[in-house]
């Protein structure tokens, strides 16, 4: 990946944070604020990871501790998002157990980047989208689901590399703004 692409990744990860912050301040809803907290826990780590990758500071751009911390914070944000969309302590506890297991695996000395570390994150992201279905909020579920997978399509390593020249990660970050908006809209509709 080119330095310019990593710098663009660092900038575009700020968009979901700005979107969520504006919505949290506008709605003054506790659950939306929890979404913001999860987003703000992940954003500085992701921004730093991409910035340092752009500066060539990682011996291995993919398999390094800052990348593991970035993925760890994604798992943490997912747990917070799950509580925000479900309001269920029981369901959030189940999600927390799943994510804690995969956080442990991320940091285990024998874990390497075999190209599959993103799979548990993708699975876990559906935990916080399912409550939208449970309350029959089909419109916001479809927007959240489709924006997640639309961005994810561009971020898929072989597609990103072969068809988008490495710029697909930026598209994923931008799609997360739409994704976050749909989550907030669902929370507000349920309030």
Residues covered by each model-derived region:
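Multi-pass alpha-helical transmembrane bundles in non-GPCR membrane proteins
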Residues: 1-191
């Amino acid at each position: 990946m080119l330095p310019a692409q990593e710098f663009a990744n660092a900038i575009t990860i700020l968009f979901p944070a700005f979107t969520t912050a504006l919505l949290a301040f506008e709605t003054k809803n506790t659950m939306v604020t929890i979404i913001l907290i999860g987003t703000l826990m992940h954003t500085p780590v992701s921004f730093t990871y991409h910035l340092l990758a752009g500066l060539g500071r990682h011996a291995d751009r993919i398999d390094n501790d800052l990348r593991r911390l970035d993925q760890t914070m994604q798992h943490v944000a997912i747990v917070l998002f799950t509580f925000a969309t479900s309001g269920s302590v029981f369901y959030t506890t189940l999600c927390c157990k799943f994510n804690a297991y995969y956080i442990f695996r991320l940091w285990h000395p024998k874990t390497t980047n075999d190209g599959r570390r993103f799979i548990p994150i993708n699975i876990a992201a559906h935990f916080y989208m399912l409550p939208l279905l449970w309350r029959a909020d089909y419109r916001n579920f479809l927007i959240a689901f489709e924006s997640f997978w639309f961005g994810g399509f561009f971020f898929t390593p072989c597609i990103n590399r072969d068809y988008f020249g490495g710029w697909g990660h930026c598209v994923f970050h931008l799609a997360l703004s739409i994704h976050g908006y749909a989550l907030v809209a669902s929370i507000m509709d349920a309030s």
